[in-house]
Amino acid sequence: MPTIKQLIRNTRQQIRNVTKSPALRGCPQRRGTCTRVYTITPKKPNSALRKVARVRLTSGFEITAYIPGIGHNLQEHSVVLVRGGRVKDLPGVRYHIVRGTLDAVGVKDRQQGRSKYGVKKPK
């Protein structure tokens, strides 16, 4: 326990909270351009080919973002909207691409959980 004199001399340091998505710079989403679209394999015990894109954001950061849903139309130079949110079995992937906005079209034939994949209500 510090004495009163020690506390006067130098005050207690505030605990700084570290953001989990620094490339967004405090914004809920950021626009970016795809520089590379490719697949990577998840860590053990999972096995798949997960679709990801390397995105250059308007904030100047170059990040790796996950492309959710089945099938996509993204390629190099596609303009996408990126939100925070990591993918647990892909190390280094801390962002998601928002489907149904800008160049990323919604998932085809999606019936449930449509709002997360940018799909309009079927007629």
From Swiss-Prot:
Function of the protein: With S4 and S5 plays an important role in translational accuracy. Located at the interface of the 30S and 50S subunits.
Keywords assigned: Chloroplast, Plastid, Ribonucleoprotein, Ribosomal protein, RNA-binding, rRNA-binding
Family that this chain belongs to: Belongs to the universal ribosomal protein uS12 family.
GO cellular component: chloroplast; small ribosomal subunit
Assembly notes: Part of the 30S ribosomal subunit.
Subcellular location: Plastid, Chloroplast
Biological-process GO terms, alphabetical: translation
InterPro entries per record: NA-bd_OB-fold, Ribosomal_uS12, Ribosomal_uS12_bac
UniProt-listed SUPFAM superfamilies: Nucleic acid-binding proteins (SSF50249)
PANTHER family, alphabetized: 30S RIBOSOMAL PROTEIN S12 FAMILY MEMBER (PTHR11652)
GO MF annotation terms: rRNA binding; structural constituent of ribosome
Protein name, as recorded: Small ribosomal subunit protein uS12cz/uS12cy
Entry-linked HAMAP family: Ribosomal_uS12_B
